A protein has these predicted regions:
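Positively charged, low-complexity intrinsically disordered leader regions
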Residues: 20-90, 94
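Phosphate/diphosphate ligand-binding glycine-rich loop within oxidoreductases
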Residues: 66-177, 297
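Phosphate-coordination loops involved in phosphoryl transfer and adenosine-cofactor binding
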Residues: 72-77, 184-186, 286
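Glycine-rich phosphate/diphosphate-binding loop of Rossmann-like nucleotide-binding domains
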Residues: 82-94, 178-251
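Short, structured coil segments at secondary-structure junctions
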Residues: 99, 130, 150-152, 210, ...
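Rossmann-like adenosine-cofactor binding region
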Residues: 227-304
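Adenosine-phosphate binding glycine-rich loop
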Residues: 286-345
Length: 345
């Protein structure tokens, strides 16, 4: 069995770059048949659009006053979080409950992991209690994929190491789509710690497949080698690309994943890459300011920008609920179809 600590294949290199015919000029919805959601790298533009459209369906009903749905009634969802989380864990838990599923929230610190039980054995024991879907966050890149090979239930990646965070990427894209008629031709800047950011990876896969122009911006020390091969442009000075951007997604510096100093000081980083009122004056008047959170006020973003009229940060949190409802619903539908097919054989 592959060790989840073997994370080498989950960095930008040596992953296989997208095929030359990407990104597409348009994307029609594609019927959803996948049992797991492990990342955006392997999804087609049509599959991405299917998730976004399903999220839009829930959002429309929600805004019309419908806040409870029966789509997952009779099923059980387990949130297995082996890393701390506020927004993602709460959002998935609430999404499952809004769909009428039974939910359990697993906490690693109070589990049998402290007694030597393995990650896989823990998951298999939880599945044996009648779980239909598992939402997994883990510090090791590739852990959800390994789990998906061992369990019969659906697996959703809620963030694994520096690999991917697919639902965060989806909700970022959904938020942009909610404010713009199309992603095609939009210029989106991902600013900050690209090297350690699973959010950056999922955003790059999703945005480029849907036709956006993506600029990654940050210190050279926080930029993965060879990232240009993935259809993005690289900038090391935010001021050089600021006026071109339709959307700016400010990524948190991942101090907990860093070994050593990647820039002189936090103050220096904020001076070069932080979004502040002065920079807003040079940006497009309708630029969208995003941040996956948690935000560090005064580092990647100043309070006046975070709370300003261009900020859609809280919209991202709200939209995360609809994206996760969509993912849970679509995977459950695919699981039901596969179960029926197996029973009919």
């Amino acid at each position: 069995m592959q060790s989840v600590s073997d994370a080498t294949r989950y960095y930008f290199l040596p992953l296989t770059p997208p095929m030359p015919d990407l990104p597409p000029t348009s994307a029609s919805p594609t019927p959803w048949t996948r049992k797991h959601l492990l990342g955006l790298q392997d999804l087609s533009a049509g599959e991405l659009t299917t998730i976004l459209n399903e999220a839009e369906r829930y959002k429309t009903k929600w805004n019309a006053g419908e806040t409870k749905f029966d789509d997952l009634r009779g099923t059980a969802v387990a949130n297995l979080f082996f890393e701390p989380s506020t927004r993602t864990k709460t959002s998935f838990s609430l999404a499952a409950k809004r769909l009428s599923a039974d939910t359990i929230d697993f906490t690693a610190s109070s589990s049998s992991l402290s007694k030597g039980e393995t990650f896989i054995d823990t998951a298999l024991n939880i599945q044996a209690m009648g779980i239909h879907q598992m939402v997994v966050r883990h510090s090791s890149s590739g852990a959800p994929e390994q789990l998906a090979r061992e369990v019969d239930c659906c697996v959703i990646n809620a963030g694994d190491g520096t690999h991917e965070h697919p639902t965060q990427g989806l909700l970022d894209i959904f938020t942009i789509r909610s404010h713009r008629p199309s992603l095609q031709g939009l210029t989106v800047a991902l600013v900050g710690d690209i090297k350690h950011s699973r959010v950056a990876r999922s955003n790059i896969w999703g945005l480029t497949k849907l036709g956006a122009r993506v600029i990654v911006c940050g210190p050279p020390t926080l930029m993965p080698v060879g990232i240009e091969e993935f259809g993005v442009e690289v900038a090391h000075r935010l001021d050089d690309v600021l006026e071109q951007c339709d959307c700016i997604n400010l990524l948190r510096v991942q101090f907990e994943r860093q070994r050593g100093a990647y820039f002189p000081s936090v103050r220096e980083y904020a001076h070069l890459y932080g979004m502040n009122g002065t920079r807003m004056k040079h940006a497009k008047p309708d630029v969208l300011i995003l941040a996956p959170g948690p935000i560090n006020r005064g580092v990647e973003i100043t309070p006046d920008v975070a709370d300003g009229q261009n900020s859609v940060i809280l919209d991202q949190v709200t939209n995360g609920l609809f994206i996760r409802m969509a993912c849970l619903s679509l995977l459950n539908g695919a699981r039901s179809v596969q179960t029926q097919q197996e029973q009919s054989r």
